[in-house]
From Swiss-Prot:
Protein name from the UniProt record: Glycerol-1-phosphate dehydrogenase [NAD(P)+]
GO cellular component, as recorded: cytoplasm
Species for this entry: Pyrobaculum neutrophilum (strain DSM 2338 / JCM 9278 / NBRC 100436 / V24Sta) (Thermoproteus neutrophilus)
Main location as per UniProt: cytoplasm
Keyword set, alphabetical order: Cytoplasm, Lipid biosynthesis, Lipid metabolism, Metal-binding, NAD, NADP, Oxidoreductase, Phospholipid biosynthesis, Phospholipid metabolism, Zinc
Protein family (similarity comment): Belongs to the glycerol-1-phosphate dehydrogenase family.
């Protein structure tokens, strides 16, 4: 008999044009007085100010994500406004102080908009607080705002979704070989998000219509729910993410660094090849939306890519993937050659 299971998923999801205007309705159902709004450094600050003005009846303070003092308390509600970094910092603060969290994504570049988990890079920096898990009580995705985000960020969101087929296959492999707990329902949710973008890559790639962004946001939210059900990032993060993390760790802070979703898409192509999955289909979908489909296009050096492929398995030793105990340099190079990434 299986043990008792529990999971947390967002109780409210509002998306569409003008969704940001619904924030007061969501907050009115909570017993809060002081609100911390965490934003990015650029255009997202203006959206954070909009949220603050909508909550004029509350005491709201706006901080950029790199200004947040995790030891400072006194807030009743945390609202993250922006892309990956402000939303991740909002999750960390919510987790540390056990306060409810609302996320307001201003772009859709990865599945962190609905996930209870944070990026690998940030998780390493804040691991003294434990494993950060903070499921938002509400997601407010205003598609009119997201539609105005840089196209590169939106394409990166597609790239993140292209990796889900590999993540699920890695999970299944770990289940069979290592006895890891597996949720078919969570896996199917993740795969559904992958299938949505592959089937519609040619139509949504330019992101000129609200419905294009809506399809992307729905798929990303579906992945966040899948992770909540699984109780881990397993259904959405496998060897393709380990490859991306290995490169991100080396290039952190570098000028012109590749975006997370772009690296995930490249990783998905290589890992699909190793799994025997139809990697050409993934590469075709990536090309259809304008994602880099070669290392050169992504600005990644061959030596760095080989290093990432041969060391990625060490980043999370507890997460078994197709990489096993690691690829040899020659096997890594052959995979890159066979998939025409070089």
């Amino acid at each position: 008999m299986k043990q008792l299971e529990s999971f947390e998923i967002p109780r409210t999801v509002v998306f569409g044009p003008g969704a940001i205007l619904k924030i007061p309705d969501i907050v009115s159902g909570l017993r809060v007085g002081k609100v911390l709004i965490i934003s990015g450094k650029s255009a997202t600050q203006q959206y954070a100010k909009t949220v603050a003005s909508l909550l004029s009846g509350y005491s709201a303070e706006i901080l950029k994500y790199d200004e947040v003092e995790l030891e400072k308390s006194g807030f009743d509600l945390i609202i993250g406004v922006g892309g990956g970094r402000p939303l991740d910092m909002a999750k960390v603060y919510s987790y540390v102080h056990k306060r409810p969290l609302i996320v307001v994504p201003t772009s859709a570049s990865h599945d962190g908009i609905a996930s209870p988990y944070i990026s690998y890079i940030l998780a390493e920096k804040v691991k003294r607080y434990g494993k950060v898990v903070a499921s938002p009580i509400a997601i407010v995705a205003d598609t009119s705002i997201i539609l105005s985000a840089p196209r590169r960020l939106l394409r990166a969101g597609v790239g993140d979704l292209l990796g889900k087929v590999v993540a699920v296959r890695d999970w299944q492999l770990a289940h069979r070989l290592k006895g890891e707990e597996y949720s078919e329902y969570a896996a199917l949710l993740s795969l559904s998000s992958y299938r949505i973008v592959v089937a519609n890559a040619g139509k949504i790639g330019n992101f000129v219509r609200e419905e294009d962004v809506r399809a992307l946001v729905k798929a990303l939210i579906g992945c966040g729910v899948a992770m909540g059900i699984a109780g881990s990032s397993r259904p959405c993060s496998g060897s393709e993410h380990l490859f991306a993390h290995a490169i991100e760790r080396r290039l952190e802070g570098a000028e012109g660094e590749a975006i997370h979703g772009e690296l995930v898409a490249l990783g998905a192509i290589v890992m699909a090849y190793l799994h025997g999955i139809n990697w050409r289909r993934i590469k075709k979908a990536a090309g259809a939306v304008g994602l880099p489909t070669t290392l050169k296009q992504a600005g990644i050096d061959l030596d760095l890519a080989i290093e990432a492929l041969t060391t990625a398995h060490t980043l999370r030793p507890d997460r078994y993937t197709i990489l096993g105990d690691g690829l040899s340099a020659s096997a890594a190079r052959k995979a890159l050659e066979d998939t025409e990434l070089i």
